[in-house]
């Protein structure tokens, strides 16, 4: 299924990262926090301003982003894969 988010929404797939302690010990999955990095899969057309103009989003498909994981981030299953749908304002940075 193809998904097209509306307005300033962004669809993100979590990017799992191996977690190690400072001493080099790999943490098991249940001892790790969920990563707050992901790959942008789809973006909406943009934020609608009070003037009625549409401001395009700063992120684009393929970007690796760092985001706030919490209230306002919707988890959905698309074709058996968990994705996150969030507002662009929930994205803190683009990793380059």
From Swiss-Prot:
CDD domains: cpn10 (cd00320)
GO biological process assignments: chaperone cofactor-dependent protein refolding
Subunit (UniProt): Heptamer of 7 subunits arranged in a ring. Interacts with the chaperonin GroEL.
Protein name: Co-chaperonin GroES
Compartments where located: Cytoplasm
Natural source organism: Chromohalobacter salexigens (strain ATCC BAA-138 / DSM 3043 / CIP 106854 / NCIMB 13768 / 1H11)
SMART domains: Cpn10
Family from the record: Belongs to the GroES chaperonin family.
Recorded GO CC terms: cytoplasm
InterPro entries cross-referenced by the UniProt entry: Chaperonin_GroES, Chaperonin_GroES_sf, Chaprnonin_Cpn10_CS, GroES-like_sf
Role noted for this protein: Together with the chaperonin GroEL, plays an essential role in assisting protein folding. The GroEL-GroES system forms a nano-cage that allows encapsulation of the non-native substrate proteins and provides a physical environment optimized to promote and accelerate protein folding. GroES binds to the apical surface of the GroEL ring, thereby capping the opening of the GroEL channel.
Alphabetical list of NCBIfam families matching this protein: PRK00364.1-1, PRK00364.1-2, PRK00364.2-2, PRK00364.2-4
Chaperone among keywords: yes
Gene Ontology molecular function terms on file: ATP binding; metal ion binding; protein folding chaperone; protein-folding chaperone binding; unfolded protein binding
Keywords: Chaperone, Cytoplasm
